[in-house]
Amino acid sequence: MMMEDDDDDFYDPADAVPINQAQDAPQNQSNEKSQELNEGEEQEEEIEVEEDEDDFNIITEAPPDAPPPEVPHPRHANLRAEPQRPSSADISTKSVTPTVTPKLEAATPAPASARPTAPQKPGSAYPPVQASTIDVNANPVHPSTGKPILSTDMDSDFPTEDDKPWRRPGSDISDYFNYGFDEFTWASYVLKQQELRKEVQDQKKQLDDMQNFLTMGLPPIPGAPGPAAPPGSAPPALPGMPGMPDIAPDMMQGMLASMMSQGMDPSSMDPMSFMQHAQAMMGGQGGAGAGQQQGQPGFGGQSQNSGFGGQGGGQPHMGFGGYDQRGGFGGRGRGRRW
């Protein structure tokens, strides 16, 4: 009914309104104004709330298509402040223009009279050259024992406590031992030095013996032929070591080549092992060409060193057909007894 009344108030003529309604019209208008004011205030409040919400959304949520704000950078500012580079055409035009290169003038050498000269002094005017006089390999004699230092025994040469002053309370051990040694480390050092020197001497002796044996420079053995054979004859057999027969040079070369082919180094072998290998190799080859030596009558013309079948004549301690000066005793072809 209120809506209809409102419509009537707006659209119907005034005379069509009844009297009672005409009296109530001012009151209705005042009520309507108050309602409109209330509704207007509510709408304003809603608009303010919506505006507040819109402002909040704008601040917190940026639209997805909006570009991010550019952060100022000092380098970008410097680049913007720099002048623009000229184009390639400008560069080409500038490069065409000839440039004058400055000439470098050679510096004139100073005269010899202006140069500072070193003072000319005789050699005696300078201090003498000082060189160390310490012999690092020296082995001086200890004054109290009368023995070389490396041969001094701490227990036998210093038997009592009075002879060992470094053991006394308050004594400085550096007054008696150098380079951080003490009584025990010095004794072990001396022992190691003696062992090393002995080992080095033994190795040198073995090396010298091996070199002499390989080069056949051994002194002549008593009973060996002294004078040399005349030219044109076969080379004499070289004197061997005790316990070995004389060795021809070609046989020695063959023995060395055979040892090297078996993987042995003759220069690193001691003399005893070399002799054993040489005897073993000679034992297998001794009877091969021994049948041409002069034989004895009554033994079939066999050589003195021939064994069974002319083989193994140089092998000692053979049982059947071994080395025997009677020549092949018990073997075949003894010859005919007369």
From Swiss-Prot:
Residues 283-332 have a biased composition (Gly residues). Keywords: mRNA processing, Nucleus. Residues 20-31, 85-100 have a biased composition (Polar residues). GO terms for cellular component: mRNA cleavage and polyadenylation specificity factor complex. It is found in: Nucleus. Residues 1-169, 282-338 are annotated as: Disordered. GO terms for biological process: mRNA processing. It comes from the Eukaryota. Residues 106-118 have a biased composition (Low complexity). InterPro entries: Fip1_dom, Pre-mRNA_3'-end_processing_reg. Pfam families: Fip1. Residues 1-12, 38-56 have a biased composition (Acidic residues). Belongs to the FIP1 family. Pre-mRNA polyadenylation factor that directly interacts with poly(A) polymerase. This is Pre-mRNA polyadenylation factor fip1.
